Amino acid sequence: MAFPIPARQLFIDGEWREPLLKNRIPIINPSTEEIIGDIPAATAEDVEVAVVAARKAFKRNKGRDWAALWSHRAKYLRAIAAKITEKKDHFVKLETLDSGKPRDEAVLDIDDVATCFEYFEYFAGQAEALDAKQKAPVTLPMERFKSHVLRQPIGVVGLISPWNYPLLMDTWKIAPALAAGCTTVLKPSELASVTCLEFGEVCNEVGLPPGVLNILTGLGPDAGAPIVSHPDIDKVAFTGSSATGSKIMASAAQLVKPVTLELGGKSPVIMFEDIDIETAVEWTLFGVFWTNGQICSATSRLLVHESIAAEFVDRMVKWTKNIKISDPFEEGCRLGPVISKGQYDKIMKFISTAKSEGATILCGGSRPEHLKKGYYIEPTIITDITTSMQIWKEEVFGPVICVKTFKTEDEAIELANDTEYGLAGAVFSKDLERCERVTKALEVGAVWVNCSQPCFVHAPWGGVKRSGFGRELGEWGIENYLNIKQVTSDISDEPWGWYKSP
C-alpha cells in the first residue's frame, strides 16, 4: 500500500536535529522487502546532546520545573492522548506499514495508547494521585518524632523499547516516566521506529516542554549502549531479549544504576481434560499467532492432557489452516510478515532444527505459496517434542507452537516450569480450584486463566527468572520511576540528652 513515510530527524530538546554524523538507516517494508524511507542513526555524540537536554529540563525553573507539580504534568499527558486520538488513522497506517502487523491489530495498539481509559489517560490520573500520596505519614513508636514519606522522580531515565509493539511499548515506558516527573531519552528499535518519531511531533504540537522527551533512533551498540553507560542517566528501562538485557544489567551495574528489564519468554499454556475444546483452541492460536507470533509472552509451549490431545490438535490444525495470511492492510488479515529478513531466517532455522532433532512439523513451517515477496511464515504447529529439543527450550519469537502431552497435574506443572524463563503462563480448566493451584505453582510473573494474552494497563506486568525483574503498568509502573525519601522530624522541645553537657 502506497503511503508516504514522513522524513524525520532526531528529536532533541523539542527540535528536529540531524544526527551529528549524518548517518541514516533504511526502512524496509516487511510485506514487500522494499526500502520505503529511512531514519536517522544516532551515535554517542547525539546521546550526549540529548542527555544534556533532558537534565536541563529536569532542573529548569526551580519550583516550577517539570518535576515539581504532578497535576501540571497530567494536563500534558491528557493532551497527548487527545492528539493521538485525533491522528489515529495516520499512526495506524504507519505502524502497519513499518512493522507488518495486521491493520486490525495496529488499530487496537493505537487505541490502547490514546483512549481515555488507557495508557496516557491512566497515568495522568496516577500523576494526580501522587499529589495525595505526598507526605504520607509513617507511624512511629516514639511520640517525640514524626515521619513522612516523599515520592520524588528518579531523574533522567533511558528508555529502550522493542519492535513488536513499537508505539505501544514506548508508551508503557514514556507515560509512567513522565507522570512520575522524570525526563527521558528514548531509543526505539531501529527495525520499527516510524511511529516513535511521529510521537515527537505530537509532543511538539501539545507544547511539551523542550527536553522532557528526547527520541534517538539508531542501532543498539551505537545509540542504546551509550544511553545505558552514560553517568547522567539515572535509570534504564528495557524491553527486549534476555541476552541484551544481561548486557544492559552488567553495564548499568558499573554505576550502580537501577534497571527494569522485561525480557524473553517461553510461556506454557496448559489444557486440562475438562475444557471446551473450541474455545480453548481459539485462545491457543491467539496466544501464539497474535502480532505474527512476535510476542515476548507468547504461550508457545502447549501442554495438553493426553486424553484430549488427538482431538485438540486436530481442531487446532483446522483452525490454523483457516487463518488469513496476507498483506497486513487487507481486510480480515490475521497474520502478516515477521519484522525482518534476519528474523525470518532465524525462525526458519528453528523449524529446520526441530525437524532434524526428530520433531514433526504437523502444520505450516514454510513460506505461504501465494506470497512470493515479504517475510511471511505459515503458522506452524510442531509435535513429537522432547524437553531436550531447542524448540522446547529457546524463544522463537515467531508464529510457531510446540505441543507436548501430560498425564497428571503435577506433571503439567513440572513441564511448564521446565524453562529458564518466567514471563507468563496460561491454564485452562473448568475446575477453578485446580486453576488456582496451578496458578500458584507456575514460576511466572503473569498467569491467564481460561484465556491468553489479555493485558490491561491497570495490572502489573513483568517476569521472573531470565524474563527479567521490575514491574511495568498500573501503580507499580509509576513507582519504577520514583525515589522514596524518608523525612523524620524531632517535634519535642526537650534536648535529646544522650551526651553530657559540657
UniProtKB/Swiss-Prot annotation:
GO terms for biological process: cellular detoxification of aldehyde; glycine betaine biosynthetic process from choline. The keyword Transcription does not apply. It is found in: Plastid, Chloroplast. InterPro entries: Ald_DH/histidinol_DH, Ald_DH_C, Ald_DH_CS_CYS, Ald_DH_CS_GLU, Ald_DH_N, Aldehyde_DH_dom. Pathway: Amine and polyamine biosynthesis; betaine biosynthesis via choline pathway; betaine from betaine aldehyde: step 1/1. Its EC number is 1.2.1.8. Homodimer. This is Betaine aldehyde dehydrogenase, chloroplastic. It comes from Atriplex hortensis.
